[in-house]
């Protein structure tokens, strides 16, 4: 983990201050829910975000979130699902109460994630735990182990959002945390998104600058949508084989450090997974040892008291090992995987930034080519058929001769179209440059936020893991000291 602690990005002048943009609308809040969970799960620590300190662009507002108590609902039907208790403590003014408690299912978290990703494209929105898991294939996605691990992951998702200077002020996040009528919010936002996508589909073709002129006839919504999808696919396919001409060294270093972080996390994950398997084996061995000593009581009734006490102590140790294994596997091991996924979200943001720069460079190259072509036409190069004309100009000239076109008039018409194209391209280049520069600044701030959130999360996870080990060994010492005292009282152990 030494490589992780060295990710300080000291050679990049990043600013962690961020203006708190966006206002949140007030929402109605009903009574708090208090369902009884069906699983005996170790409660995740609710004060995960209490490590926030002032001076990091977060403001004075407190936002602490916790996810716990998975509950299987509609049991016995095909529509069964698991809901999670989401509790929030906050000092935000737009919350109706400082403490809120609601139940949300995983699809609610998915809707929140997609909405945040759509509304904040320049932010590295923390990812959700992967839904494509073997538990869905084996059918044990309602098991205690799976739901507990998911509760920890969902808690980390909300904690990251609460630590983000922009996402923590999002209106949709606040609604998610306290609204008693969340389903109505999802329906209204879904219908609004569909209507907005329908109205903007006809304009998407004009937003993408192409070499040809705009068509005069109008097309239907379905054709416009199909053309837009095809254009986006074509752009993605072409840009996959296009590299940035002037890569920014700052973001190259960020990607290299992210790759190193992923490598370190993968290595630590393997080690922790091996430790978890050893703890499972030790738990099974202790249980087996306790069972064998229970059988010994039948063979040696004279030592029933000491043997029974010893077997009970071994059984208590096995229970402690089980709690330690659950803390290691469900919380800490899951946090490593979640952090690797969060690093992937940052890499996706770097790819989006690179795409903005690539758009600017391609538009600039297209503008330069159009300007050079205009200069050649203005000097009469194509019309004279000289060396400047080239093969294309020569062929065009011959075709115009066959068609009986006036060369001078054709040259002036092409020159006029080039002037219009250059004028449009100049505006687009300036716009793309400004967009790329602004996106660069946002990504720099996002990297700084990612580093801060990562440090807080790792500190909390290390502290939680150390505390679970301390609790286990304290409990084990108490168990065996109690056993020794009992044996001393019975005279089975020499004082």
UniProtKB/Swiss-Prot annotation:
This is Sorting nexin-4. A 1,2-diacyl-sn-glycero-3-phospho-(1D-myo-inositol-3-phosphate) binds at residues 105, 107, 131, 150. Sorting nexin, involved in the separation or division of vacuoles throughout the entire life cycle of the cells. Involved in retrieval of late-Golgi SNAREs from post-Golgi endosomes to the trans-Golgi network, for cytoplasm to vacuole transport (Cvt), and autophagy of large cargos including mitophagy, pexophagy and glycophagy. Required for invasion of the rice sheath. Residues 406-443 form a coiled coil. It comes from Pyricularia oryzae (strain 70-15 / ATCC MYA-4617 / FGSC 8958) (Rice blast fungus). Residues 62-184 form the PX domain. Belongs to the sorting nexin family. GO terms for cellular component: cytosol; early endosome; endosome membrane; lipid droplet; mitochondrial membrane; phagophore assembly site membrane.
